[in-house]
Each structure stands twice: as C-alpha cells, then as structure tokens.
Amino acid sequence: MILFSIPVKDGFFSFNVDNGSVLFAGSRYGRLDPKVAKGLVDRFGRLGFSFLTGCANGVDESFRLALSESDYTDSTTVACAFEERTYKLKGIFSLFVVPSGLSPKVALAKRTLWMTCRCSLLVLFPSDPIGKGSALAFKSAIYNNKPVFVVTETKPEETDLFSVYKSNLFGIVDGYWCIPPVYKETGLCYEAG
C-alpha cells in the first residue's frame, strides 16, 4: 500500500492506494515535456507500481517513449484498440484488448474502459476543455472507485461521486486529486471493489 497525503486547510487528507498499476492517459493532441513523463515514470516505478498506457498519439506516445527508455519496460503494458498497432510498437509489451471488427470510436472507448478497470489510479493529462476520451477515462476511473490525478489549471467541479483537492504530484506536475467517497470513509482503495 502506498500512502498519499494532500495538504488541506486543517492538516492533511491521506489515502492508501494498492501499488498495482498506474494508468497514464490524456489528450491525443497534447505532448509532454520528456522530463515530466520520465519523472513520473521514475517516481511511480520506485514506489513499486506497474504501468498502463494506450496506443494513441499525444500523451500516450509521450509515456510510451518514457517507459520504453526506463528501467520499468518489463512492468509496462500498452493497451491497443487496433491490432495492427501491436505489431508496430517495438521494445515494449503491447496487447490488443478489444474484440476485432469494432468501429474505431467504439474500439477506443472499450480500450479506455479496459485500462481504467485494471489500474489502481489514473494520472490524466486532458486538453482544456476536456475531450471525450479523457472524460470517459475520468468517469470510468471514478465509477470504479479509483483516485484520479488530473493535470489541469481548471479545477474539476466536485460532485457526490468525488471530492477535489488541489495538489502537486511528486513536485513534477500541478493539478487536482479527485477522490471517490470510499477513500474519505476508509482511506483504503481496495475496500471499494
């Protein structure tokens, strides 16, 4: 279990995450500074996390590159919505995770749902305003009681499904933790499932 603590007005809000897999996702049109992607991979890797990311351009591609050049290649899965992409990705484990014959839109959505069901937490780099794919990843993670760190300047609107805490992730990126209510009650994510 990994403890995350977020400074709040009267102390800290802390929650534990099973150190399973961290999912990196975000905009197909965004690119990350390689130092950001490598820094996050290194920090989560040292905590014992394995990694999930997608096969798309943009944020996925930034993390695939960082992961392929890291010490954590053996603990990485790239989830692909299109079988031909699994053959193009070299040096990193890629897996075709949706049924054949789906429309591209449906295949991408199913791939996103596959990843969010298998991660312990989501680190999301959406466009502003948030795109459909990032919105689906966010909602799916929250509905599956997974904490989400959203790298954005725009504070997500708090709902009954999650609380929002402004924070910084490892001194690398600023954003907001979106925490499902189960964490507030127990502090433990694995009790949610």
Provide a role label for each language-model segment.
Residues 2-19, 28-175, 181, 187-190:
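Acidic/glycine-enriched connector segments
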Residues 25:
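Residue-level detector of conserved, well-ordered beta-strand and adjacent loop positions
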Residues 193:
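Cysteine-nucleophile amide-bond enzymes
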